[in-house]
């Protein structure tokens, strides 16, 4: 009787384990069938940025392959979707780093002149637009805001790209059905908008000459 009971317990344990394993396999297969990469099921928060050269190659190919900002946004999302979930997070983190590195009063002055005004949000989307213009444009303007004059397009009134801010999040959501920000290790990755420095502005829109001092070329050609 005892042996029979032991055999029954063993049978139930093995059966339950097997069913559990099959359930996991079924869930994983369902996830893959729905376009959710299996590695997101155990994806840990990350602070690792995407390789910078890979990042810029994606951005610069988007410039070459599209003619409008809307098409560029669609292109970027499609290309980011082809990355691994961790790389998608890395794309967002690399963007955050580039935004962080250009959060300064001189570039804000340039953005104000070129756009005829610039709020907090507008400055964020202006820098997204700058990133979307490629590596050379980004670093040239980062070092010399007046170089923005070389990117001015006749007839264009707005130099912002709000959609760029969301491309990695949208791609991640499309492929994993999860929110990208839940997988960022904020304890380690601190170069984000929550930690922007407090700026001490030396220019004032009510005193235009202070803006001219920072961006003489932009001021001369665009200030009205």
Regions found by a protein language model. Give the residues of each.
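Short, hydrophobic/amphipathic alpha-helical patches that form generic packing surfaces
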Residues: 56-61, 93-97, 101, 121-136, ...
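Bacterial Sec-dependent N-terminal signal peptides
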Residues: 1-34, 40
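Hydrophobic/aromatic-rich, well-ordered segments within soluble, folded domains that form packed cores
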Residues: 112-142, 148, 153
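Long, solvent-exposed, polar/charged low-complexity segments
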Residues: 28-37, 42-44, 56, 180-224
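A glycine-rich, hydrophobic loop/mini-helix early in the fold
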Residues: 77-117
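N-terminal leader/targeting peptides and immediately adjacent processing regions
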Residues: 23-85
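An amphipathic alpha-helical core segment
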Residues: 151-201
């Amino acid at each position: 009787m005892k042996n029979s009971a032991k055999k029954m317990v063993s049978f139930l344990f093995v059966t339950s384990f097997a069913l559990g394993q099959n359930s996991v396999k079924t869930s994983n297969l369902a996830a893959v069938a729905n376009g959710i990469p299996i590695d997101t099921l155990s994806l840990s928060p990350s602070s690792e940025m995407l390789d910078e050269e890979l990042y810029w190659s994606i951005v610069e190919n988007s410039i070459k392959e599209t003619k409008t900002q809307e098409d560029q946004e669609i292109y970027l999302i499609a290309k980011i979707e082809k990355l691994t979930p961790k790389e998608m997070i890395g794309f967002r983190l690399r963007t955050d780093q580039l935004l962080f590195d250009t959060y300064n009063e001189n570039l804000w002055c340039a953005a104000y002149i070129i756009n005829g005004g610039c709020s907090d949000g507008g400055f964020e989307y202006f820098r997204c637009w700058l990133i979307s213009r490629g590596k050379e444009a980004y670093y040239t303007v980062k070092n010399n805001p007046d170089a923005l004059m070389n990117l001015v397009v006749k007839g264009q009134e707005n130099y912002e790209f709000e959609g760029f801010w969301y491309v990695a999040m949208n791609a991640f959501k499309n492929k994993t059905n999860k929110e990208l920000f839940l997988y960022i290790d904020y304890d380690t990755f601190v170069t984000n908008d929550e930690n922007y420095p407090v700026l001490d502005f030396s220019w004032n829109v009510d005193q235009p000459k202070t803006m001219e001092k920072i961006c003489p070329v932009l001021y001369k050609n665009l200030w009205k």
